[in-house]
Amino acid sequence: MSDTEEVEHGEEEYEEEEEVQEEEVHEPAPPPEEKPRIKLTAPKIPEGEKVDFDDIQKKRQNKDLIELQALIDSHFEARRKEEEELVALKERIEKRRAERAEQQRIRAEKEKERQARLAEEKARREEEDAKRKAEDDLKKKKALSSMGASYSSYLAKADQKRGKKQTARETKKKVLAERRKPLNIDHLNEDKLRDKAKELWDWLYQLQTEKYDFTEQIKRKKYEILTLRCRLQELSKFSKKAGAKGKVGGRWK
């Protein structure tokens, strides 16, 4: 306890005792016995230790200023850490974005290489198929050219029929092109468009069915032609052998 507080406390005790004494004086009571009374005096402050209230106030102000400065420093330190964390977060986001862009670029390059490789393989297969087909056609032509004159005439007739079929096919395409009408559907409502779509679907289904039937017929015809060619080859060989056996010494046996 400071000296000032001791002085104040002593004064308060002294005043309380005086009030008690005054109350006792006013109350009617029998004359008390005389006792020696103790005289209370306020404690004296030493001359060398005077209390400076201005100094105490300054110390309190300095303490408040120090606490306020500590709060300000703490606030700015927290703000600085938040800004550093925000900058680090932005850097991580930019880094992740750059990594994602690099991954997409690498993926696009790989996809481009894959597409180029597929296109190259497709072109190579088509070239091999075309070469194989050309070789097969050449072999067929050589095999057919080695046949007899009768078979050559048969081929000529077959080519003539094929030419007629091709001419008929071209004529058919021309007729179909002339018969084909433009599809005017701008003025149709939803129900009519649905009916028109169903009609076109049925027509396409019918065409596919006819195409399948014609394809099967062509396959059967090709098989029959191939069978006839094999029979002609066998007959030509048999006729050559029979002619060699029947003629002896320049005259028939």
From Swiss-Prot:
Q: Which Pfam families match?
A: Troponin (PF00992)
User: Is Acetylation included in the keywords of this UniProt record?
Assistant: yes
Residue list for modification N-acetylserine:
S2
Gene Ontology terms, cellular component aspect? troponin complex
Q: Which UniProt keywords apply?
A: Acetylation, Muscle protein, Phosphoprotein
Q: Does the keyword Acetylation apply?
A: yes
Q: What does this protein do?
A: Troponin T is the tropomyosin-binding subunit of troponin, the thin filament regulatory complex which confers calcium-sensitivity to striated muscle actomyosin ATPase activity.
Instruction: Name the protein family.
Output: Belongs to the troponin T family.
Q: Tell me the protein's name.
A: Troponin T, fast skeletal muscle isoforms
Organism, as annotated:
Coturnix japonica (Japanese quail)
Q: Which gene is transcribed and translated to give this protein? A: TNNT3
